[in-house]
């Protein structure tokens, strides 16, 4: 189940020579309930690529969102991305589960934190 989402964060750097991962500002990690080394999916809004990697904690308040290693080929500075974390939960907990959603501005400062995904009026 979706556990955490950082919505439309801006890539601040891409370091191809780093060993791998995505570095995320500690404040954003805490707001999204993401842990160091946790597996995440990253969706690049600009080019449509999707990747799977793990989180490294960046400096608190830095706004840092850095793609590292091979992941750096999937986006560039200024691209908008969505970072998704997942968890396994029991079937009974699916009835009450609400993901933690973090919204940020262009400098990756938190603008809103909420639980649950609102129905956006899309017909299925």
Curated annotation (Swiss-Prot):
Q: Gene Ontology cellular component? A: cytosol
Query: Which sites bind substrate?
Result: 53, 69-71
CDD domains reported in the protein's UniProt record: Asp_decarbox
Q: What is its main location?
A: cytoplasm
Required co-factor(s) are: pyruvate
* Cofactor note text: Binds 1 pyruvoyl group covalently per subunit.
Q: In which pathway does it act?
A: Cofactor biosynthesis; (R)-pantothenate biosynthesis; beta-alanine from L-aspartate: step 1/1
EC number(s) reported in the record: 4.1.1.11
TM segments? none
Q: Which residues form the active site?
A: 21, 54
**Could you tell me the keywords of this UniProt record?**
Autocatalytic cleavage, Cytoplasm, Decarboxylase, Lyase, Pantothenate biosynthesis, Pyruvate, Schiff base, Zymogen
From the UniProt annotation, give the residues forming the signal peptide.
none
A Gene Ontology annotation in the biological process aspect, one of them, is:
pantothenate biosynthetic process
Where in this protein does the record say Pyruvic acid (Ser) is found?
Answer: 21
Catalytic activity, reaction form: L-aspartate + H(+) = beta-alanine + CO2
Domain of life the protein comes from:
Bacteria
* Keyword field contains Lyase: yes
Where in the cell?
A: Cytoplasm
Q: From the Swiss-Prot or TrEMBL record, what is one GO molecular function term?
A: aspartate 1-decarboxylase activity
S-S pairs: none
Classification via PANTHER family: ASPARTATE 1-DECARBOXYLASE
Q: Member of which family?
A: Belongs to the PanD family.
Subunit info here reads: Heterooctamer of four alpha and four beta subunits.
Function noted in UniProt: Catalyzes the pyruvoyl-dependent decarboxylation of aspartate to produce beta-alanine.
Q: What is this protein called?
A: Aspartate 1-decarboxylase
Species name for this entry? Dehalococcoides mccartyi (strain CBDB1)
Q: What is the lineage of its organism?
A: Bacteria, Bacillati, Chloroflexota, Dehalococcoidia, Dehalococcoidales
Which gene codes for it? panD
């Amino acid at each position: 189940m979706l556990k955490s989402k950082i919505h439309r964060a801006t890539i601040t750097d891409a370091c191809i020579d780093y060993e791998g991962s995505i570095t995320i500002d500690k404040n954003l990690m805490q707001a999204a309930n993401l842990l160091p080394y946790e597996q995440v999916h990253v969706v690049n809004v600009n080019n449509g690529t999707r990747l799977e990697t793990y989180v490294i904690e960046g400096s608190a308040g830095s706004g840092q969102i850095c793609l590292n290693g091979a992941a750096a080929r999937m986006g560039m500075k200024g691209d908008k991305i969505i970072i998704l974390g997942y968890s396994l939960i029991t079937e009974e907990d699916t009835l009450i589960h609400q993901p933690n959603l973090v919204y940020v501005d262009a400098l990756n400062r938190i603008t809103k934190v909420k639980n649950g995904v609102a129905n956006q009026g899309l017909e299925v």
